[in-house]
UniProtKB/Swiss-Prot annotation:
The active site is at Y152 (proton acceptor). Belongs to the short-chain dehydrogenases/reductases (SDR) family. This is Alcohol dehydrogenase-related 31 kDa protein. InterPro entries: ADH-rel, NAD(P)-bd_dom_sf, Sc_DH/Rdtase_CS, SDR_fam. It comes from Drosophila melanogaster.
Amino acid sequence: MFDLTGKHVCYVADCGGIALETSKVLMTKNIAKLAILQSTENPQAIAQLQSIKPSTQIFFWTYDVTMAREDMKKYFDEVMVQMDYIDVLINGATLCDENNIDATINTNLTGMMNTVATVLPYMDRKMGGTGGLIVNVTSVIGLDPSPVFCAYSASKFGVIGFTRSLADPLYYSQNGVAVMAVCCGPTRVFVDRELKAFLEYGQSFADRLRRAPCQSTSVCGQNIVNAIERSENGQIWIADKGGLELVKLHWYWHMADQFVHYMQSNDEEDQD
């Protein structure tokens, strides 16, 4: 179990929809500080959050998840002045625009990876941090393919690969930073938008999705926090249809164990 009491939480996402509902739940968990980094200002949402728990300090910065990593470093140097340290980093910025592959990949995958690479040194126990937890909010079509939203699905598959790689004990045993992901199923805020398929053959399915039964953003937000509280390093959760399910991870490359053993034996030989 991960206790959120007294934690310093940094949430990278637009403060609307799933991010807002997740933040509302976080504010009921007696966290000490909440930093919200988003692309546009939303003072009404910030005020709504503050009313839930006046004693929790809320900070806001406008943030472009696609900025260069060197700019992120300068940015987070300023963020850390207010936050002191970060216990939990939540990455929730997302874009589904099949007509703009670059923007979709940069927002959903590259920007998230650059954010993690920038923030990790502040959290790393061996670099003066306190350890903690990184939560990547992604999609169920990062687990199974989508013939309609091909670029979006590819970016979300990347998030899962990055999460599982970074959660390896090779890193966790050193830096004390656990990494997990929550895959959201179809959620109202997503399907309410005008959705375009990657190819015109899939457009009828994209149009039909807008009328499909979907979970509410509030239920999804609650289950994201539930997953955080139940999390262990490397876990992948599905938050869909009002429920929460732990993904059973599978290794397809049967040489993986032998390869890792080989690499570890070489490390031991180098130390000798």
